[in-house]
């Protein structure tokens, strides 16, 4: 059975990869920042939440 910690780690890796690819493309495309600003901030919030949750679940003894 897969625990919650590996799930958070996999999600963190996926979101990190998506942000590494998407943010430079959005910033480099003229006019795209105005349209995609909410998506970038939502992704940053999701990434931050995953970092915190991963740390919390890693610190809690099993």
Swiss-Prot record:
Task: Give the way it sits in the membrane.
Answer: Multi-pass membrane protein
| Gene3D superfamilies reported in the protein's UniProt record | Photosystem II PsbZ, reaction centre
Question: Which Gene Ontology BP terms does the record give?
Answer: photosynthesis; photosystem II stabilization
Q: Where are the transmembrane segments?
A: 8-28, 41-61
Q: Where in the cell is it found?
A: Plastid, Chloroplast thylakoid membrane
A Gene Ontology cellular component where this protein is annotated is: photosystem II reaction center
Q: Which UniProt keywords apply?
A: Chloroplast, Membrane, Photosynthesis, Photosystem II, Plastid, Reaction center, Thylakoid, Transmembrane, Transmembrane helix
Alphabetical list of Pfam families matching this protein = Ycf9
Coarse class of the primary localization is plastid
Family, as annotated? Belongs to the PsbZ family.
Main function: May control the interaction of photosystem II (PSII) cores with the light-harvesting antenna, regulates electron flow through the 2 photosystem reaction centers. PSII is a light-driven water plastoquinone oxidoreductase, using light energy to abstract electrons from H(2)O, generating a proton gradient subsequently used for ATP formation.
Per UniProt, subunit arrangement is: PSII is composed of 1 copy each of membrane proteins PsbA, PsbB, PsbC, PsbD, PsbE, PsbF, PsbH, PsbI, PsbJ, PsbK, PsbL, PsbM, PsbT, PsbX, PsbY, PsbZ, Psb30/Ycf12, at least 3 peripheral proteins of the oxygen-evolving complex and a large number of cofactors. It forms dimeric complexes.
Its recorded name reads Photosystem II reaction center protein Z
